[in-house]
Regions:
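N-terminal pre-ligand scaffold of iron-sulfur
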Residues: 1-61, 75, 89-113
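Short, exposed beta-strand "edge-strand" segments with a Pro/Gly-rich flavor and a Y/T-containing core
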Residues: 5-11, 70, 84, 137-141
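A residue-identity detector for tryptophan
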Residues: 29, 35, 68, 84, ...
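Short cysteine clusters
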Residues: 47, 66-69
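Short cysteine/histidine-rich metal-coordination sites, predominantly Zn2+-binding motifs
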Residues: 61-67, 80-89
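Short C-terminal domain-edge/linker segments immediately following a structured domain
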Residues: 64-65, 76, 95-98, 122-125, ...
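M16/MPP (pitrilysin/insulinase) zinc-metallopeptidase core fold and M16-derived inactive scaffolds
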Residues: 73-79
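Mature, well-folded catalytic/scaffold domains that follow N-terminal targeting or propeptide regions
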Residues: 102-156
């Protein structure tokens, strides 16, 4: 069931609390809803490093760790703690009565994020991060090398 604002009914809050996790789909995205330390969080159920399902991972101290390559993600923001992995997409969660509703979160400027990831990948020599950033920029209609990237220390 989808609400007027695009939120998707993921399941019951009692099931989420009992099982610790729910899986749903919001638009084209598979979504993992996690009950952790008394609160519900939702992130894309695909590790951005290699695409494996995050629902097989572990949660500890507000972090979700991918079961396969151990990439770590902050449950609240989806931000990675590992430079070689990308951030995962976070979703907003609302619990009303005994229903868990999940909706897409405004993600900000995707092109700016991808340009930042390209710069970080180049700085750290991470070819996977570079490739994913370039492909993302092309998909977003941006030219990856169309403008000069400002580098720390004044080099460009």
């Amino acid at each position: 069931m989808t609400s007027e604002n695009g939120a998707v009914l993921a399941g019951s809050a009692s099931a989420l609390r009992a099982d610790g996790r729910l899986l749903t789909k919001v638009g084209a995205w598979p979504v993992l809803v996690v009950w952790h330390e008394g609160r519900a969080y939702a992130v894309e159920d695909r590790c951005p490093h290699m695409g494996f399902p995050l629902h097989r991972g572990t949660c500890e101290a507000g972090l979700l760790t991918c079961h396969w390559h151990h990439a770590r993600f902050d449950l609240a923001s989806g931000s990675t703690l590992d430079r070689w992995a990308d951030d995962t997409r976070p979703f907003d969660v609302a619990i009303r009565d005994d229903e868990v509703w999940v909706s897409p979160r405004a993600s900000g400027d995707e092109v700016t994020r991808l340009q930042r990831r390209l710069r970080e990948g180049l700085e750290d020599g991470l070819s996977l991060v570079i490739a994913k950033a370039v492909l993302g920029l092309i998909d977003a209609g941006a030219e990856p090398a169309a403008r000069r990237i400002s580098w720390p220390g004044g080099r460009s």
